[in-house]
Amino acid sequence: VGVIGHADRARPLRDYCLGLMMPCERKSVEPMAAVTAPERTAAQHQSLLHFVGEGRWSDEMVLAKVREMVLPEIERHGPIEAWIIDDTGFPKKGTHSVGVARQYCGQLGKEDNCQVAVSLSIANADASLPAAYRLYLPQEWAKDSARLRKAGVPDDAGFKTKHEIALDQLRWACEAGLPRGVALLDAGYGNNSELRADITGLGLTYVAGILSNTTVWPRGTGPLPP
């Protein structure tokens, strides 16, 4: 309760998380209300809508509390071995959810209408735990101040590339003293040479996927001048 501010938010938080895990096609508030409280759907809809849209609580504090509770259990099976950078797409049918746009959705394996979140998970061979999570805000959203205000997005939420978000998360994890692991990145991130250099600058070892047409030069060599 301490991390969400008020005791009366505990029930909506539980119901919202339950709704996200239920096998309903749409993960918006209305269908979630119907499956989590079928006997009082209208009241549940208002409760969840207020919690998600107007309730003030820190997602970072929630993640920190989860990490405090779960990380010791993971480390019982062995030390943290990897920091995994990835993004997750959430298919959407409408246009009002924050950050929704036509973009690549890994869940569908193609471009489609979706939201995308960049995450950093810490893991060993037994389990993984999301340590940082941020919604990617496409430029078409970041440049539309009226759309941002209507959706309740904070004024200081500017545009950042997915690579910049990933680097922010890795830098934060280093500063926060999370147990170190090898940074793992797929080609969507690993093919960015600036990101790889910045990760090295953080003192991290990384294993990164790259595209098959990437040119690689041995250390100390390079292309001849034109």
Where are these regions (language model features)?
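Gly/serine-rich nucleotide phosphate-binding loop at the start of the catalytic core
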Residues: 1-53, 58
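Short, flexible segments with low predicted structural confidence
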Residues: 2-5, 130, 145, 170-171
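Short, charged/polar micro-motifs that form catalytic or ligand-binding hotspots
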Residues: 3, 18-22, 38, 106-110, ...
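Short, contiguous clusters of charged residues that form electrostatic/catalytic patches at enzyme active sites
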Residues: 15, 115-118, 164-171
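Alpha-helix C-cap/termination motif
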Residues: 23, 35, 76-77, 176, ...
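A generic secondary-structure signal
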Residues: 35, 68-72, 168-176
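Active-site-proximal, Lys/Arg-enriched surface segment
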Residues: 52-139, 144, 149
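An internal, acidic/charged active-site-proximal segment
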Residues: 146-226
